[in-house]
């Protein structure tokens, strides 16, 4: 009889204790995008699902997106931008909805995914000579505006010549801007010399 009473009380208590969850002292709660909302606390962001469960814990590497007049991280096609600092230079990559890094931070800038593609600035290192006295390679860096797939592979180069860049924090204090924009799934516009636009059609 005593065991039955204890079991009965446990059945009553468990649903009550498990039915509510509070997340306190939040600075901001975003609207839902793809059934996930960003929440901010003490300078870090996390993601909750539609029943208020934290599915990605608070972290400081999530990249915010401008939505109207407000900035907050979003998932777009199951990818969210992240940022990592290496030698005081920002590199961008992506996580999936489990919080796993699926595209390692490697781009000098990157955009959200749209129709299975995203714009990014891919960094290329060119070894042009070798300093025999110092036993060091002489290298130059440039970046290309590319269209990547959801695995981070560059599918198309929108500016094949690239843009020379000095990979130093004193010269690269902010991420370079992405000048291209997506017009449709297979059509992109790239701003070249004299601020003129070039339309580029890529393979589906």
Regions found by a protein language model. Name each.
Residues 21-204:
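Residue-level detector of conserved, function-critical positions
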Residues 1-23:
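Bacterial Sec-dependent N-terminal signal peptides
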């Amino acid at each position: 009889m005593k065991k039955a009473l204890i079991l009965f009380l446990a059945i009553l208590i468990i649903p009550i204790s498990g039915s509510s969850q509070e997340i306190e002292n939040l600075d901001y709660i975003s609207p839902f995008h793809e059934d996930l909302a960003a929440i901010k606390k003490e300078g870090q962001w996390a993601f909750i699902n539609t029943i208020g469960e934290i599915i990605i814990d608070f972290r400081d590497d999530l990249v915010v997106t401008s939505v109207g007049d407000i900035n907050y991280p979003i998932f777009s096609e199951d990818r969210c931008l992240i940022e990592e600092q290496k030698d005081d230079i920002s590199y961008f990559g992506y996580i999936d909805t489990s919080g796993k890094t699926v595209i390692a931070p490697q781009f000098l800038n990157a955009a959200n995914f749209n129709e299975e593609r995203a714009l990014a600035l891919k960094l290329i290192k060119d070894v042009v000579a070798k300093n025999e006295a110092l036993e060091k390679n002489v290298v130059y860096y440039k970046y290309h505006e590319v269209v990547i797939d959801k695995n981070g592979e560059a599918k198309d180069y929108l500016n094949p010549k690239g843009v020379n860049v000095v990979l130093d924090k004193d010269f690269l204090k902010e991420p370079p801007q992405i000048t291209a924009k997506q017009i449709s799934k297979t059509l992109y516009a790239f701003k070249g010399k004299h601020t003129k636009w070039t339309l580029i059609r890529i393979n589906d």
